């Protein structure tokens, strides 16, 4: 039902502040789910299982992190038929993020700019929400995305990632280490060769220790930026293989404005997502695949607005895909279209 109605609702939603519309939609989606209306508003998607990172995904279309930062809306979002859902980014301590307004639509370009700044309620509240999810309890594949607090010095970033990893590990299908948001000062420095080598070494050791402790191996993936040159992609790919990291998510938002110059809000600070990042993010997927081969599976995200876009990510070397901005513009029909295009 929502597939048909979303185009009618969208003008009203787009008349609201972008962040207010975001919360309004999620709250009403969760309310409908709790009233037992999830089957009426969502998608029924046939299973098309893929095993990636040792995890069985019911279908290859997932929700990217950022839409549900606190894991508070998992059950409502699950009604869209995702093969997996990623929530976060979460940090050790609660933080408000950047001042509002901090999210902007560029409808002429099917794009968003955000400078949210990892606003979240902290990892303990996050875990409580995850544990309360019925969908997760019934076997839903849930990725938990972790980051560092804004006031943690970059030299101590590993402490924040370790703190979060230890707490989310028992509750995750996989864990994503976000080092690529442009909205936390100096965070992307962690993509540098020496910084990344040190961080991955630390996290891999912790993962092995936690696997022994919990008698369960939870894969760890790294989320990277699209704003990388060939040498940087090569260095990151080599580090992923060398440290036996389980997966990589390519990509986060871009700081480039080349594709949206002159549009309202184009010069707002933050990360640009949506259709304009498609080519750039797909290039990173393709280049990264040439470096890592089959050793490190890639989850492709960035600018997916159609089944053909999802197929292009897979053809470039991704094993799974994620959507976010396309969902805002197209609604849950996008999930159905992508799943159909990728059906084996």
From Swiss-Prot:
The keyword Disulfide bond does not apply. InterPro entries: Aldolase_TIM, DHO_dehydrogenase, Dihydroorotate_DH_1_2, Dihydroorotate_DH_2, Dihydroorotate_DH_cat, Dihydroorotate_DH_CS. Substrate binds at residues 69, 114-118, 178, 183, 252-253. Pathway: Pyrimidine metabolism; UMP biosynthesis via de novo pathway; orotate from (S)-dihydroorotate (quinone route): step 1/1. GO terms for molecular function: dihydroorotate dehydrogenase (quinone) activity. The keyword Flavoprotein applies. FMN binds at residues 65-69, 89, 145, 178, 223, 251, 274, 303, 324-325. Catalyzes the conversion of dihydroorotate to orotate with quinone as electron acceptor. Signal peptide: none annotated. Keywords: Cell membrane, Flavoprotein, FMN, Membrane, Oxidoreductase, Pyrimidine biosynthesis. This is Dihydroorotate dehydrogenase (quinone). Its EC number is 1.3.5.2. Its main location: membrane. One of its GO terms (biological process) is 'de novo' pyrimidine nucleobase biosynthetic process. The active site is at 181 (nucleophile). Gene3D superfamilies: Aldolase class I. Binds 1 FMN per subunit. It is a peripheral membrane protein. Monomer. It catalyses: (S)-dihydroorotate + a quinone = orotate + a quinol. GO terms for cellular component: cytoplasm; plasma membrane. The gene is pyrD. It is found in: Cell membrane. It comes from Cupriavidus pinatubonensis (strain JMP 134 / LMG 1197) (Cupriavidus necator (strain JMP 134)). Belongs to the dihydroorotate dehydrogenase family. Type 2 subfamily.
């Amino acid at each position: 039902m929502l597939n048909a109605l979303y185009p009618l609702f969208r003008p009203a939603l787009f008349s609201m502040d972008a962040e207010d519309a975001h919360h309004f939609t999620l709250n009403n989606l969760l309310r409908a789910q709790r009233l037992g209306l999830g089957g009426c508003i969502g998608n029924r998607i046939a299973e098309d299982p893929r095993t990636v990172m040792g995890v069985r995904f019911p279908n290859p279309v997932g929700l990217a992190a950022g839409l549900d930062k606190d894991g508070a809306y998992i059950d409502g979002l699950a009604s869209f038929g995702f093969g997996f859902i990623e929530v976060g980014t979460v940090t050790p301590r609660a933080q408000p993020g950047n001042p509002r307004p901090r999210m902007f639509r560029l409808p002429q370009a099917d794009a968003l700019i955000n400078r949210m700044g990892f606003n979240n309620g902290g990892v303990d509240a996050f875990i409580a929400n995850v544990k309360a999810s019925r969908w997760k309890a019934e076997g839903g594949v849930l990725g938990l995305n972790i980051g560092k607090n804004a006031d943690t010095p970059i030299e101590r970033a590993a402490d924040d990632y370790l703190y979060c990893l230890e707490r989310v590990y028992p509750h995750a299908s996989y864990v994503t280490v976000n080092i690529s948001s442009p909205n936390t000062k100096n965070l992307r420095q962690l993509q540098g060769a020496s910084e990344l080598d040190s961080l991955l070494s630390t996290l891999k050791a912790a993962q092995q220790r936690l696997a022994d402790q919990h008698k369960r191996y939870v894969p760890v993936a790294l989320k990277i930026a699209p704003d990388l040159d060939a040498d940087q992609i090569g260095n990151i790919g080599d580090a992923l293989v060398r440290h036996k990291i389980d997966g990589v998510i390519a990509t986060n938002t871009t700081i480039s404005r080349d594709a949206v110059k002159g549009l309202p809000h184009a010069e707002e600070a933050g990360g640009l997502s949506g259709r304009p990042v498609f080519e750039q993010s797909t290039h990173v997927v393709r280049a990264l695949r040439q470096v890592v081969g089959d050793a490190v599976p890639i989850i492709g995200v960035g600018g997916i607005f159609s089944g053909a876009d999802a197929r292009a990510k897979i053809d470039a070397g991704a094993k799974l895909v994620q959507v976010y901005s396309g969902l805002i513009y197209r609604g849950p029909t996008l999930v159905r279209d992508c799943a159909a295009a990728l059906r084996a």
